[in-house]
């Protein structure tokens, strides 16, 4: 394909036909299991507080809003879907566009397709099994293996991530030639993420999908803390052939705790010189009413299609990557 022919799609038509078949297969998977498909807004007056996510911001100008109203493109449909759970919708899934103002590259596009679903009365392990079922059905891959975050660090880096201090983490980073970044980093979780990215991820999910679960409690995000070990959160991620595919939680249902976590995120943002983000008070109010105990997961569909088709880049499986949009 000519580099100057920017009008052309980034994906071939055969790839788009295969992608459509995979989307239909995903919908059949959930229809067969009685999971309701829903659609929620792509824009909201609130957004994520996570220091590692950069949302797009826009302004609405219309009747009653002559001065404009700030809106954010959704990085995930999570908050709206949880409000539906509180309203009594039962198990739900969504295939939707999500937006993150981050890098563009082999595995990234600022606009992408997300598959997200929630299962009331499922614990983390039962949802992991369902994710495994979906991957086997779509990718025709072997059944997944699982190991804890702690086991992964001990196996590949010979360090315990739950007890190591920052000095010990920097020593391991030096062995990975990461001292130029690690030596000036004061946030322990950022150091852990650095080691996970460069020391663990390249070693897992080579032959079969790999679940990594029980991330440190300090990285809980919207997940519950384990009742068996308060050092870890009921959170998992899935990796296959060098690609992070999904991130799942045994969902936090405590409104007060969720408010505190959002506020803590904003304090971290301020400390790093990042803008603080508006907290989604509609979600907090919904949690006060009571969300059923549930587990949920977000899966990158474009990456899933990449794996299914054996493509090398995301651009090969989406109609128009951002440089051709």
Curated annotation (Swiss-Prot):
Q: What is the effect of changing residue 108 to A?
A: Severe reduction in lysylation activity
Q: What is its EC number?
A: 6.3.2.-
UniProt key word ATP-binding: yes
Binding locations of ATP: 100-102, 109, 244-245, 300
Question: GO terms for CC?
Answer: cytoplasm; cytosol
Q: Which UniProt keywords apply?
A: ATP-binding, Ligase, Nucleotide-binding
Which top EC class applies here? ligase
Q: What does the record say about the knockout?
A: Cells have a reduced pyruvate oxidase activity and a reduced growth rate. Cells lack CadA activity (lysine decarboxylase).
The effect annotated for residue 103 to A is:
Loss of lysylation activity
Q: What does the annotation give as the result of altering residue 303 to A?
A: Loss of lysylation activity
Q: What does this protein do?
A: With EpmB is involved in the beta-lysylation step of the post-translational modification of translation elongation factor P (EF-P) on 'Lys-34'. Catalyzes the ATP-dependent activation of (R)-beta-lysine produced by EpmB, forming a lysyl-adenylate, from which the beta-lysyl moiety is then transferred to the epsilon-amino group of EF-P 'Lys-34'. The substrate (R)-beta-lysine is 100-fold more efficient than either (S)-beta-lysine or L-alpha-lysine. Cannot ligate lysine to any tRNA.
Task: Name it.
Answer: Elongation factor P--(R)-beta-lysine ligase
């Amino acid at each position: 394909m000519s580099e100057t022919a920017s009008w052309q799609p980034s994906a071939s038509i055969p790839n788009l036909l295969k992608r459509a078949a995979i989307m239909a297969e995903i919908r059949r998977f959930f229809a067969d299991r009685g999971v309701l498909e829903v659609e929620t807004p792509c824009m909201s007056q609130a957004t994520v507080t996570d220091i590692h996510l950069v949302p797009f911001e826009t302004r609405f100008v219309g009747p009653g809003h002559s001065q404009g109203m700030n809106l954010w493109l959704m990085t995930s449909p999570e908050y709206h879907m949880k409000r539906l759970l509180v309203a009594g919708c039962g198990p739900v899934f969504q295939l939707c566009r999500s937006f993150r103002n981050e890098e563009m590259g082999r595995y990234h596009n600022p606009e992408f397709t997300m598959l997200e679903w929630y299962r009331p009365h499922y614990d983390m392990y039962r949802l992991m099994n369902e994710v495994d079922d979906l991957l086997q059905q779509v990718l025709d891959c072997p059944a997944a293996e699982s190991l804890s975050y702690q086991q992964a660090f001990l196996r590949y880096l010979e360090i315990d991530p739950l007890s190591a201090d920052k000095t010990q983490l920097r020593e391991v980073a030096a062995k990975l030639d990461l001292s130029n970044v690690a030596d000036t980093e004061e946030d322990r979780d950022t150091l852990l993420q650095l080691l996970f990215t460069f020391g663990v991820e390249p070693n897992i999910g080579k032959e079969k999908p790999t679940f990594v679960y029980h991330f440190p409690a300090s990285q809980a995000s919207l997940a519950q803390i384990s009742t068996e070990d308060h050092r870890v959160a009921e959170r998992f991620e899935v990796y296959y052939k060098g690609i992070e595919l999904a991130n799942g939680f045994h969902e936090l249902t405590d409104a007060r705790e969720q408010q505190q976590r959002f506020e803590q995120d904003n304090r971290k943002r301020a400390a790093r010189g990042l803008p603080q983000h508006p907290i989604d008070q509609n979600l907090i109010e919904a949690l006060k009413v009571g969300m059923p105990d549930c587990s949920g997961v977000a899966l990158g569909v474009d990456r899933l299609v990449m794996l299914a088709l054996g493509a090398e880049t995301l651009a090969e499986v989406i109609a128009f990557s951002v440089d051709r949009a």
